[in-house]
């Protein structure tokens, strides 16, 4: 049970597509003992925990990548938090921001929207200490624009998957959230889900 809780904390609880959560969201891990493997030592338990966490993380990432009409898979990695909660709040604010996600869909790196999300996340941060890298390129240093050419940053976010690194430079804690862009097609799909499926059925696109 502890292995499952630990794995969920760093995987399924670290993903978002639109910030919403279903009351039906469930993670089940079942074991019937058929493998004959016994966890008898701390080393055995640790190895199992690491393997389970890896599987959970990969499955969680697939949920994000399979989101309706998403075009980009983005890893938001925050470091330098004074507390774990501080880093978590910053990462989640960026990962759930409609403005940030919309800019990614438009191939706009827009680090200004990222730092704005960090600013309103509810954690105490020092804007003049924040560094932001987008796809490995410096976008912001000390709260102001870095020297990386805008065209290079724009090119960096045109790929299907990239990472945004945000260093708060306040401490040693970090947090990662896996998210997506926000596309017009996603909005169109979700603005009337039942009508969408009725039309798809009428068009012969569903079984």
Give the location of each predicted region.
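A structural signal for small-residue-enriched, beta-sheet-centric alpha/beta enzyme cores
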Residues: 1-207
């Amino acid at each position: 049970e502890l292995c499952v809780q630990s794995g969920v904390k760093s995987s399924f609880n670290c993903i978002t597509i639109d910030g919403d959560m279903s009351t039906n969201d469930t993670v089940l891990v079942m074991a019937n003992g058929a493998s004959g493997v016994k966890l008898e030592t701390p080393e055995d338990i640790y190895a199992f925990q690491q393997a389970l966490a890896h599987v959970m993380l990969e499955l969680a990432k697939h949920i994000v990548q399979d989101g309706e009409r998403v075009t980009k898979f983005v890893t938001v990695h925050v470091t330098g938090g004074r507390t774990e909660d501080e880093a978590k709040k910053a990462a989640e604010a960026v990962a759930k921001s409609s403005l940030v996600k919309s800019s990614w869909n438009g191939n706009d790196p827009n680090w200004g929207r990222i730092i704005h999300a960090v600013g309103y996340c509810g954690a105490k941060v020092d804007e003049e200490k924040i560094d932001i890298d987008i796809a490995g390129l410096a976008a912001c240093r000390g709260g102001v624009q870095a020297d990386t050419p805008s065209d290079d940053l724009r090119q960096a976010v045109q790929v299907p998957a990239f990472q945004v690194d945000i260093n708060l430079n306040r401490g040693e804690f970090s947090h990662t959230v896996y998210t997506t862009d926000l596309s017009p097609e996603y909005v169109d799909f979700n603005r009337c889900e039942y009508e969408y499926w009725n039309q798809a059925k009428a068009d012969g696109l569903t079984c």
